[in-house]
């Protein structure tokens, strides 16, 4: 039995693409220990990485002059370091006859240059505007995850295999990750795997090349997979706990809104006046999310056709906080149903993945959350994606290379609850005079991601070079669900990577994001497509890592 905490072979493509940087990772050089018994094996893998980042873009004062967006923008000046960070990831596998075993992995980090003091626009401070943090110092949560030194346990699970009659059943119990479907990039918005695991978006933004093991946060759960016949396999998962997705915290460099999410202490409303952030409203029972899947691999198909059903509590909140007596808080939706189909097969020399899914009572893009029932807008939505992975055509310009393309589509079928709170251009936005240019959702959304990575082998003895280039673009419309993509927004990254003797990987990567703003009042941008408040945060990252 393979001890991997992932269940789709195509997953190898996107660990680094979580942050749209898409750097490759050198093969891990594992240490294997002789335990004196051939039935037992102990493998220990450790990766150490350094990342330095520098801001390249001047502040756009139409953004930095906003009292709710200035702290992230004033975090560093152009030419200053965003981070000066060391990370370590270590993993131990103890197996018995390569069938049963346990896995334990952990991550640690420290940023040598992180300043605990919150920066504000000096003009706003002089007017009496408070920062989003008490005493103008980052909270303990922010200091733990951004400064350190700190760490956490990731995987901690046991695995094994047994036979029920003549049918083999593979089991895993403990803290691990399960990921279904064929998505490569659009895993957190339009895929079958949406909400199946919380994500560490903080780390994916801060650390280029973060692996899936670091970014997909494992949760305590029980999962199984059984090969019922040579052509049919069944799988199931039951979660024993719930964890929220981690976002870039307000007031840090990659955050667009100062008073969100779990880090800030308060929300400034006017000079000298702020309201406190309250504890989030999380699911009543942090257990019970489950899923079932069946995979069929008939010979004539030359691939895999799979069906899925999941019922889950969302690790992502409605992104508009709820205003309640005494403060504001985030609210996490419960009881979402997802039905899906996927196809994974070869098509010529390329690999093809297709997904079609429908969500019932899915949380929608919100203007707010009702205080009557602690619910935001919900609806039924349709999602589809198609992706292909292949090798670049042979040419004298490079030695080899790969390309990956993914097209995503979503459609709002119906608003089933709190239509007045739905941030749709014909719904809650209409009375406010807002439209799609202000980030209001449309019925349909189309987006695409393309990555091209040419490689040059043995440019020096033992040295291979690669030039990963990745662009993600919103082609049409604004998605109806949270963070599902918006028209005319993009993320572009261009990197130069060197793999040295398959032991050391270095990379230099430029990253830029763009979203248009639509309204400027008194010199301050007040509205636009989602992501407009970080459009002036271009940066360049240098990283070096080794594994042993």
Map each language-model feature to its residues:
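Short loop/turn motifs that connect adjacent beta-strands in outer-membrane beta-barrel proteins
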Residues: 30-44, 57-59, 93-102, 115, ...
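Signature for the C-terminal beta-barrel architecture of outer-membrane proteins
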Residues: 206-392, 409, 430-439, 474-475, ...
């Amino acid at each position: 039995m393979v001890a991997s905490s992932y269940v789709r072979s195509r997953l190898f493509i996107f660990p680094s693409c979580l942050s749209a940087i898409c750097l490759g990772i050198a093969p891990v050089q594992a240490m294997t220990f002789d335990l004196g018994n051939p039935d037992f094996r102990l493998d220990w893998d450790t990766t150490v990485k350094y990342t330095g980042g520098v801001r390249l873009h001047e502040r756009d004062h139409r953004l930095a002059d906003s009292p709710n967006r200035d702290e992230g923008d004033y975090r560093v000046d152009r030419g200053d370091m965003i981070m000066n960070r060391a990370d370590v990831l270590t993993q131990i596998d103890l197996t018995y006859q390569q069938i049963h075993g346990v896995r334990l992995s952990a991550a640690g980090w420290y940023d040598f240059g992180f300043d605990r003091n919150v920066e504000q626009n000096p003009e706003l401070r002089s007017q009496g505007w408070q920062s989003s943090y008490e005493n103008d110092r980052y909270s303990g949560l922010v200091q733990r995850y951004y400064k350190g030194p700190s760490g956490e346990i990731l995987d901690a699970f046991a695995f094994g295999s047994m036979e029920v009659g003549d049918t083999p059943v593979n089991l895993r119990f403990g803290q691990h990750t399960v990921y279904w479907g064929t998505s490569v990039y659009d895993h957190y918005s339009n895929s079958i795997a949406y909400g199946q695991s919380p994500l560490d978006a903080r780390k994916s933004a801060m650390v280029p090349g973060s692996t899936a093991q670091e970014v997909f946060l494992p949760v305590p759960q029980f999962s199984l997979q059984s090969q019922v016949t040579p052509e049919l396999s069944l799988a199931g998962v039951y979660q024993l706990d719930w964890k929220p997705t981690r976002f870039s915290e307000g007031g840090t460099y990659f955050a667009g809104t100062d008073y969100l999410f779990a880090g800030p202490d308060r929300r400034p409303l006017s000079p000298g006046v702020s309201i406190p952030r309250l504890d989030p409203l999380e699911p009543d029972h942090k257990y019970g999310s489950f899923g079932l899947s069946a995979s069929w691999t008939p010979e004539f198909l030359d691939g895999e056709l799979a069906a899925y059903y999941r019922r889950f509590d969302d690790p992502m909140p409605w992104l508009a906080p709820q205003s309640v007596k005494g403060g504001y808080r985030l609210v996490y939706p419960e009881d979402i149903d997802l039905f899906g189909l996927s196809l994974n097969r070869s098509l010529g020399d390329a690999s093809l993945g297709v997904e079609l899914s429908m969500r019932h009572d899915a949380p929608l893009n919100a203007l707010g959350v009702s205080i009557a029932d602690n619910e935001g807008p919900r609806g039924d939505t349709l999602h589809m994606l198609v992706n292909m992975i292949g090798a670049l055509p042979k040419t004298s310009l490079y030695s080899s290379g790969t390309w990956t393309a993914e097209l995503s589509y979503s459609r709002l079928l119906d608003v089933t609850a709190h239509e007045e709170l739905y941030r749709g251009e014909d719904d809650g936005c209409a009375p406010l005079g807002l439209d799609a240019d202000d980030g209001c959702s449309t019925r349909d959304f189309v987006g695409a991601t393309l990555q091209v990575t040419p490689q040059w082998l043995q440019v020096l003895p033992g040295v291979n070079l690669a030039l990963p280039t990745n662009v993600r673009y919103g082609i049409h419309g604004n998605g109806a669900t949270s963070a599902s993509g918006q028209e005319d927004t993009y993320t572009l990254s261009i990197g130069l990577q060197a793999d040295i003797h398959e032991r050391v990987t270095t990379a230099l990567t430029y990253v830029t994001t763009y979203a248009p703003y639509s309204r400027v009042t008194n010199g301050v941008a007040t509205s636009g497509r989602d992501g407009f408040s970080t459009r002036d945060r271009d940066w360049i990252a240098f990283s070096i890592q080794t594994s042993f």
